[in-house]
Amino acid sequence: MTYTVKEIFYTLQGEGANAGRPAVFCRFSGCNLWTGREADRASAVCTFCDTDFVGVGPDGGKFTTPSDLAAAVSSRWPWRSSEGSRPLVVCTGGEPLLQLDSAAVEAFHDAGFEVAVETNGTQPAPAGLDWICVSPKSSAPLVLTSGEELKLVYPQADAPPERFESLDFDHFFLQPMDGPVVARNTRLAVEYCLAHPRWRLSVQTHKALGIR
């Protein structure tokens, strides 16, 4: 298959359990919960997305083989100065599981990478992933109900935290919804975490730091 990628870049993971860890981000184009066009936002399942995942950007491309995609990801990693660390690629979107398959996961592994995915959880995952982070969106039904991390953007009227507490994840995070009322949402998330200690707070540190 041809992999359509919006952008590939090297940065620090800004969210969740791996916050602060260097990683190459591979942002796949397309999503099943929103077209990415502002004209369609109000009618989308996910109305609060803050990411441009439409088409191919200058740091992305179309890759016709898994090895070509893995080579593009590998070219961003600072191999000469990374002795003793395990390279990490974070497959994100959009919705990466519309494109990410077992062949790509295998190619990433062959290139020396640990493979993480950030997904809305509505699509099945290929075998071999090292880290699955599910971020539920509104009332969209989940296909993925187990993994390493569940990260819930909060608050969502159709996605209360208690709906997900029986699922099989190692970490449960609330992340304040960004936007005009982010201060209010942060306060609500803090209050919920304090009242329900199973949940931890995730903040978008990359935005605070001004990095990608």
Name every feature range the model reports, one short phrase each:
Residues 1, 22-24, 45, 130, ...:
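A generic secondary-structure signal marking the coil-to-beta-strand transition
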Residues 4, 25-27, 90, 133, ...:
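Conserved beta-strand segments that form the floor/walls of ligand-binding pockets within enzyme
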